[in-house]
Amino acid sequence: AFQLDTNLVESLQK
């Protein structure tokens, strides 16, 4: 369930 969270976090970090 981290893959989905990472996708959102990366969007903000990016």
From Swiss-Prot:
User: Which keywords has UniProt assigned to this entry?
Assistant: Apoplast, Manganese, Metal-binding, Secreted
Answer yes or no on keyword Secreted.
yes
Question: Quick one: a GO cellular component term?
Answer: apoplast
- Cell compartment(s), UniProt: Secreted, Extracellular space, Apoplast
Main location group: secreted
Please provide, alphabetically and separated by semicolons, the GO molecular function terms listed in this UniProt record.
metal ion binding
Subunit relationships? Oligomer (believed to be a pentamer but probably hexamer).
Q: What does this protein do?
A: May play a role in plant defense. Probably has no oxalate oxidase activity even if the active site is conserved.
Q: Which family does it belong to?
A: Belongs to the germin family.
| Name of this protein | Germin-like protein 2
Q: What lineage does UniProt assign to this protein's organism? A: Eukaryota, Viridiplantae, Streptophyta, Embryophyta, Tracheophyta
